[in-house]
């Protein structure tokens, strides 16, 4: 779970920062880059990266099982109240937040919001007729304003523009960074 077992530092310390890959991976990162560039097949490129990451994995730094279980609950139940999903965690809420930041770089609430938004896009992308109020309540939002605020925070524009520009049909989960659509 998370990148901590690969980097060896709490991932939250890297949030909102641009870091040189050499700081974490040494000169080997240049060699890996050169190998990737030489491959034409995408599968071959990913195989190089996968092999490299598996070599870097420090099994002693993997997430505790109870943390993996919480993450799994958040992912599998994206429309539930996140506090309900966290109540069975055996330690304090502060400890849970610290562990999430260490392994994932985010709080449990932020992860849950991401999972909910991804599931929301999946629902929108598969609906032929979209009735926003139904979607708002189906996805666990208190009201339409919270739904629109979350949508705008994640993709930069409101849900109507997402539909108007056909992102739900042409390129699900990929949309223009141009806020005008």
Tell where the protein language model's regions lie, with residue ranges.
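Short Lys/Arg-enriched helix C-cap and helix-to-coil transition segments
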Residues: 112-113, 163-164
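Alpha-helical bundle regulatory/interaction domains
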Residues: 1-83, 89-93, 107, 125, ...
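HTH DNA-binding helix-turn interface
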Residues: 100-108, 151-159
